Amino acid sequence: HHPQVNFNIFHEKSIPVAEGVSAGTYDIGFCSMVEHMDDLFFVPITYQELIVIVRNDHPLAQYDSIELPALKDYALCTYRDTIPIGKTVRAILKEKGLEAAHSYDDEISIAGRINRSSKAAIVADTPFLKQFDNLKKIHLTDVPKDTRMIYMVYSKKNFITAAVEAFANFMVAHCLDLPPEF
């Protein structure tokens, strides 16, 4: 029982979250895996499937699922490759000989762009996409569902209070949503 616990919630991208946890600004963070942060411990919590989004009037909108090579004749956009998910998407596309414009920070920016264009985008299936009712979500059958993992991250070097430890244990006990093969 922890009667004096306050939660302060901050929304930030993965790298600043990891840096904040490392610096002791945050006790715990939720983010993608961030490389070269050896003082941090990343615990897999959930995943977000990488999907294709297009406008409902796009030729690909007739499909519920496709493989990546089906995108070869279409202009693609995705996250910029200076953020973890952008690096991941670029590697997946390169493996299949595909290219995309890597210029966006988040799902809202990408969906907003697709909303007004004839392009297709590769994006994580997040709740942010729900606000765009004229976009079709298409599953990628040749991309593992757990390609974009979300981790709970904490620092090995910073003091963790009993309340923070209890919260971390609660997350692991009650909130894990990992793909079956994980």
Predicted regions and their residues:
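Central regulatory/effector-binding core of bacterial HTH transcription factors
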Residues: 1-37
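Conserved functional loop/turn residues at catalytic and ligand-binding sites
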Residues: 6, 20, 24-25, 44, ...
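Generic preference for hydrophobic
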Residues: 9, 30, 42, 52-53, ...
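Hydrophobic hinge/microswitch elements
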Residues: 13-18, 22-26, 82-139
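Beta-alpha-beta core module
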Residues: 37-49, 63, 109-159, 166
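Flexible hinge/capping segments at coil-to-helix
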Residues: 42-50, 54-76
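Secondary-structure junction motif
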Residues: 74-96, 125, 160-168, 178, ...
